[in-house]
């Protein structure tokens, strides 16, 4: 979920309730400090090897998680007011995108070099990038979503969110399908070649998170009151609803497993949960660390992902820490 910087930190913490685990608490097997002050947004590569972490006042760091090594430090300018509030890594891992309130930059993740600097027509709320950086999708505060062909410069404006802010976006690896969720209580899957919707998913609240499955067969949406649903993209039918308690308001991050059988989510209350896609039942829950251990504190989970070998879960939180968890915890529960 990508909203506006510090405002997002305050909003999500206020909306969330502190979650308590049903199972005995399992600690992470690795912990990495990625931000000294706090994190504004984060993304984890599909193979689980890298993380892109936007820090308060320090730009965005591209981290090698296997070595716990900062590979690149990227900034837009020297003005701390222009913080990087939205980030994403392409599915193939070759490109990354960072955005401040009105501009975005595409980066080569091998060399660290920038391809260019572009301006958006309105405030940026969310970003996504396709393989090799060929296509970019922007969710704007104006209610529009813009799909850009970075090779030809073609721009397609999608106006299907009734002038309400587009809070979350996702893009298929080939850039053909866009998935957008907005404050108009809608999530829309639409074709970027024609601009025509394929499926419209209505919600009872603002849509705060959308995510496409890796195989292109499933999708996930959630709102501000725990109405989290997994969908069949082919038919548009509901597969399952996550078994959330009424006070579990917001899901701030989501990622499907490679085979599409499991869903990983993150929430503002330090919560990382593993779900069964078919039933919507929670399989396990982990609790992320906070900045001040032993004292009351929260942590919004901004990114979650699976390791390439399928043995571990990865997370990045607003507390500035990346963590690694064992999936064996869920199997032995």
PLM segments and residue spans:
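WD40-repeat beta-propeller superdomains and closely related acidic/aromatic-rich repeat-like regions
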Residues: 2-7, 16-333
